[in-house]
């Protein structure tokens, strides 16, 4: 682009944007080894967790330094039990933070846990759905059960936390019917969430 007066005038303004959203890690890598994922192999596969008290301390310091109350957890997966521990820290402190992160479906996530997480300021959870077919999930080595998916999404939405689902079509041996089943499920979740 040539340096013209018009080009210089195109400097964006961010003054009307909401407050700063800062990235935070609570862990590195992922503890699972899904068949399709390159993260464990590309990064050495060593899952490391930071103590939740330290994560909360970092959030408080970022809040003090930059005035932000909004955090994006950029973990490959933020374990549900660790989300609950963070919620306990935030709720006990009385601080007003807002945050979101990505986790895995789990039998330990419950209505009570999602309510606690919502109360702490969580305003979105991203889940790696990948497929809504147990056979395909098993081939993917997701270590996930379809009944966990149903329960977690239902409880999360009922707590007031929107969900963002990642899914894929065309995993080796996946049938057309299985792919269409996953698409239908995601459409049902979308309709339920409205």
Predicted regions and their residues:
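Radical SAM [4Fe-4S] cluster-binding motif and immediate context
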Residues: 2-162
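Catalytic cores of alpha/beta
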Residues: 112-114, 173-187
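Glycine-rich phosphate-binding active-site loops on the catalytic face of alpha/beta enzymes
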Residues: 194
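Short, well-ordered amphipathic alpha-helices
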Residues: 8, 86-88, 182-191
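Short acidic/histidine-rich active-site segments
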Residues: 166
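Short catalytic/ligand-binding loop motif for oxyanion handling, primarily in non-cytosolic enzymes
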Residues: 80-82, 172-175
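Ligand/cofactor pocket segment of small-molecule handling proteins
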Residues: 169
């Amino acid at each position: 682009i040539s340096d013209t007066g018009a080009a210089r005038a195109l400097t964006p303004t961010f003054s009307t944007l909401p407050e700063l959203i800062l990235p935070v890690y609570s862990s590195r890598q992922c503890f699972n080894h899904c068949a399709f994922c390159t993260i464990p192999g590309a990064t050495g596969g060593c899952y490391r967790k930071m103590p939740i008290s330290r994560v909360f301390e970092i959030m408080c310091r970022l809040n003090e330094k930059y005035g932000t109350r909004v955090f994006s957890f950029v973990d490959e997966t933020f374990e549900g039990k660790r989300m609950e521990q963070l919620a306990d820290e935030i709720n006990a402190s009385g601080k007003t933070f807002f945050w979101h992160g990505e986790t895995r479906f789990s039998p330990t996530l419950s209505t009570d846990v999602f309510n606690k997480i919502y109360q702490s300021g969580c305003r979105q959870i991203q889940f790696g759905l990948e497929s809504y077919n147990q056979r395909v999930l098993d081939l993917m080595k997701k270590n996930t059960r379809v009944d966990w998916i149903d329960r977690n999404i239902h409880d999360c939405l009922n707590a007031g936390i929107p969900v963002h689902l990642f899914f894929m079509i065309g995993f080796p041996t996946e049938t057309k019917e299985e792919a269409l089943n996953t698409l239908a499920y995601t459409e049902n979740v979308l309709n339920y969430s409205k």
